[in-house]
Amino acid sequence: MWAPPAAIMGDGPTKKVGNQAPLQTQALQTASLRDGPAKRAVWVRHTSSEPQEPTESKAAKERPKQEVTKAVVVDLGTGYCKCGFAGLPRPTHKISTTVGKPYMETAKTGDNRKETFVGQELNNTNVHLKLVNPLRHGIIVDWDTVQDIWEYLFRQEMKIAPEEHAVLVSDPPLSPHTNREKYAEMLFEAFNTPAMHIAYQSRLSMYSYGRTSGLVVEVGHGVSYVVPIYEGYPLPSITGRLDYAGSDLTAYLLGLLNSAGNEFTQDQMGIVEDIKKKCCFVALDPIEEKKVPLSEHTIRYVLPDGKEIQLCQERFLCSEMFFKPSLIKSMQLGLHTQTVSCLNKCDIALKRDLMGNILLCGGSTMLSGFPNRLQKELSSMCPNDTPQVNVLPERDSAVWTGGSILASLQGFQPLWVHRFEYEEHGPFFLYRRCF
């Protein structure tokens, strides 16, 4: 089974930010993480009706003969949905979570036209569409649209029958418990999956680093979290949530670009998103960066219509909102301040442990200079401690990678929730396996 370097003892540490000597990789302590790869995947229904060995439930006794298939890992975020088979190093499919819905005036009563356009379907239609996102700050608000996205992922992207594969799903920290019950209802009743499991995103991110304890700092597209985890268990009472993330950075950048004389509209947010990814960075010291001659910051960006625009100080000014949220009229703490606040709520021993295991993840942390700036801010705020920011090269897929590792471990296999268990005990059975 593949596993990232940090997930195997003896392979060396993850990359450290700063000048401190790197510590050895923390040994994986839990039994489930020591057991190695699974010798078999989840059982799924086969056409034969040969009886199985008796089990404790009547439903289990009546199950027909089964065969082995690979589990599927799905990470649904506000910006993108990633999926692929467990055991792979990275997701094989990634599509935007934003979908297209035909405008009401274009629909006629009784017509059977497509209601949701997903992925490449957005580019292959002449229908006038309204772009919508079924998530708000990481929380699902439109389950029907999520089902449409997953239908597209399973049938069109992965080209699999979901009724033949177990599915591991990621869930954001502090999400409502009803989220998990809705996931189970959708997977078991709409897709007829044979088994499923739901795991917290922060825990999966931590597993991608090969750790069992750490302070996960996740900056995604719609929301940011600072989550302390001890021996695999998140601590919700001291978890920090910030309702600003990558999408807010994009909106702020649009305003800066227009202040510089450009004329971008909300419909061109995709172009601004591309500018952010290709041209922007996080300054180690914004005051010193402003003293650099403008000519050294100026670069050209070619728009889709062939027109060129010049970018200058807005390249690094946009990312300052993470450390000074008042720039986007937010009253919440800056990311570095929230991180220190969470650490200070821990007892002395745990705080010392987490200080050396600050784990970055999420697409917005991929901005050049982000880890070094966060390291500098934390070191400045904690002069008597030794905060250490850790980074992985593909931390934008850390949640999915952690799920891929987890679903492949032999010790994890008893934690799948099977459809017959859901049918017999109801959705509350989830909480016996997913915690």
Swiss-Prot record:
Region annotated Disordered, chain positions: 1-64
Which residue ranges does the record annotate as region Required for interaction with TES? 31-51
* Chief location category: cytoplasm
The terms under GO molecular function for this entry are: structural constituent of cytoskeleton
Name the organs or tissues of expression: Strongly expressed in testis. Also expressed in other tissues.
Protein's cellular compartments: Cytoplasm, Cytoskeleton; Golgi apparatus; Cytoplasm; Nucleus
Q: Which InterPro entries match?
A: Actin (IPR004000), ACTL7A_N (IPR031769), ATPase_NBD (IPR043129)
CDD domains associated with the record: ASKHA_NBD_ACTL7
Q: Name one GO biological process term.
A: spermatid development
Keywords, A to Z, come to:
Cytoplasm, Cytoplasmic vesicle, Cytoskeleton, Differentiation, Disease variant, Fertilization, Golgi apparatus, Nucleus, Spermatogenesis
Q: Name one Pfam family in it.
A: ACTL7A_N
Annotated phenotype, changing A245T: In SPGF86; uncertain significance
Here the segments flagged for biased composition (Low complexity) are 20-31
Q: Which residues form the signal peptide?
A: none
Composition bias, kind Basic and acidic residues: at what positions?
A: 55-64
| Highest taxon in the source lineage | Eukaryota
One GO cellular component this record assigns the protein to is: nucleus
Q: What is the effect of changing A31Y?
A: Abolishes interaction with TES
Q: Which disease is reported for it?
A: Spermatogenic failure 86: An autosomal recessive male infertility disorder characterized by acrosomal defects of the spermatozoa, resulting in oocyte activation deficiency and fertilization failure.
**Function in brief:** Essential for normal spermatogenesis and male fertility. Required for normal sperm head morphology, acroplaxome formation, acrosome attachment, and acrosome granule stability. May anchor and stabilize acrosomal adherence to the acroplaxome at least in part by facilitating the presence of F-actin in the subacrosomal space. May play an important role in formation and fusion of Golgi-derived vesicles during acrosome biogenesis.
As for family, the record states: Belongs to the actin family.
User: Quaternary form?
Assistant: Interacts (via N-terminus) with TES (via LIM domain 2). Heterodimer with TES; the heterodimer interacts with ENAH to form a heterotrimer. Interacts with ACTL9. Interacts with CYLC1; the interaction may be relevant for proper acrosome attachment to the nuclear envelope.
PANTHER family reported for this sequence: ACTIN (PTHR11937)
Tell me what this protein is called: Actin-like protein 7A
